Swiss-Prot record:
<protein>
    <recommendedName>
        <fullName>NAD(P)H-quinone oxidoreductase subunit O</fullName>
        <ecNumber>7.1.1.-</ecNumber>
    </recommendedName>
</protein>
<dbReference type="GO" id="GO:0048038">
    <property type="term" value="F:quinone binding"/>
</dbReference>
<keyword id="KW-1278">Translocase</keyword>
<comment type="similarity">
    <text>Belongs to the complex I NdhO subunit family.</text>
</comment>
<dbReference type="GO" id="GO:0016655">
    <property type="term" value="F:oxidoreductase activity, acting on NAD(P)H, quinone or similar compound as acceptor"/>
</dbReference>
<keyword id="KW-0813">Transport</keyword>
<keyword id="KW-0874">Quinone</keyword>
<dbReference type="InterPro" id="IPR020905">
    <property type="entry name" value="NdhO"/>
</dbReference>
<comment type="subunit">
    <text>NDH-1 can be composed of about 15 different subunits; different subcomplexes with different compositions have been identified which probably have different functions.</text>
</comment>
<keyword id="KW-0793">Thylakoid</keyword>
<dbReference type="Pfam" id="PF11910">
    <property type="entry name" value="NdhO"/>
</dbReference>
<keyword id="KW-0472">Membrane</keyword>
<keyword id="KW-0521">NADP</keyword>
<dbReference type="GO" id="GO:0031676">
    <property type="term" value="C:plasma membrane-derived thylakoid membrane"/>
</dbReference>
<comment type="function">
    <text>NDH-1 shuttles electrons from an unknown electron donor, via FMN and iron-sulfur (Fe-S) centers, to quinones in the respiratory and/or the photosynthetic chain. The immediate electron acceptor for the enzyme in this species is believed to be plastoquinone. Couples the redox reaction to proton translocation, and thus conserves the redox energy in a proton gradient. Cyanobacterial NDH-1 also plays a role in inorganic carbon-concentration.</text>
</comment>
<keyword id="KW-0520">NAD</keyword>
<keyword id="KW-0618">Plastoquinone</keyword>
Length: 84
């Protein structure tokens, strides 16, 4: 008889976000970050509600465009999550 592995299977890693993905900002990841400290004391609600479009990914950062008349922003990829 073959022994069975009693370890629980590892959780699947979430799919990486790609250019064109609809995203929103994860509030808990953003609140104590360097990006939050460099911005207004209160972040606008629309970044947490989404959707924003991921325009470009460079290294650990992604450029997000919101469907509002505001400038595009660069945020760390670990602060973004899918709006789906």
């Amino acid at each position: 008889m073959a022994e069975t592995d009693s370890k629980a299977p590892a959780k699947a890693k979430p799919a990486a976000l790609r250019k064109g993905a609809l995203v929103k900002v994860n509030r808990s990841a953003y609140n104590d970050s360097l990006e939050a400290a460099a911005s207004d004391p209160t972040a606008p609600d629309y970044i947490f509600e989404g959707p924003g479009e991921l325009l470009l990914v460079k290294g650990d950062y992604g450029q997000v465009r919101w469907n509002r008349p505001v400038p595009d922003v660069w945020l760390r990829m670990d602060q973004l999550e899918s709006c789906g």
